[in-house]
Amino acid sequence: MKDNERRILLGRVVGGFGLRGEIKIESWTEPRDAIFRYQPWLLRSPTGTESMLNGARGYETGKRLIATFPGINDRNAVEAICGTEIYVPRSALPPPHPDEYYWVDLEGLQVHTLEGVVLGSVSHLFSNGANDVIVIHGERERLIPFVQPDYVKSVDFEAERIVVDWDPEF
């Protein structure tokens, strides 16, 4: 599958809100409500059933993100889609700003030290609250803060490489 055709997991349906078919959404976008900018959505149920959805709308209320979907008009319809994951095609996301990256684009890149030692490849990333962290799988798992320019010196998508200032023994 080409990179621009990849499906990117952005959130999931977590429950109903009220009686008229409003839906509580968990969003992993930043900011949270940005999930509504990226459409169409591919909804994937826990059993693997998939359906396309265009026209999802929503708003934030307190700590909740509330959505409405075309054709979902009551609580029973919402219950039927609880647990559904929300994906979008990679091509639905705008290009990142210079020196900003989508985590999904970093996954699979080889990580090298300044001295050329290969540490492994990026498995995934997570946020620890202070910064993002690269999880590297190689001969052993390593966690490196994704902090530019302190630790991450360069990201080269053409060479499929990230260069880091990191002690390979650490």
From Swiss-Prot:
Gene Ontology annotations for the cellular component aspect, listed alphabetically: cytoplasm; ribosome
GO molecular function, one term: ribosome binding
UniProt keyword list: Chaperone, Cytoplasm, Ribosome biogenesis, rRNA processing
Domain PRC barrel residue range list: 98-170
Pfam families to which the protein is assigned, alphabetical: PRC_RimM, RimM
Subcellular compartments: Cytoplasm
GO process terms (BP): ribosomal small subunit biogenesis; rRNA processing
Domain notes: The PRC barrel domain binds ribosomal protein uS19.
Function of the molecule: An accessory protein needed during the final step in the assembly of 30S ribosomal subunit, possibly for assembly of the head region. Essential for efficient processing of 16S rRNA. May be needed both before and after RbfA during the maturation of 16S rRNA. It has affinity for free ribosomal 30S subunits but not for 70S ribosomes.
Subunit structure: Binds ribosomal protein uS19.
NCBIfam families: 16S_RimM (TIGR02273)
Similarity remark: Belongs to the RimM family.
Protein name, UniProt field: Ribosome maturation factor RimM
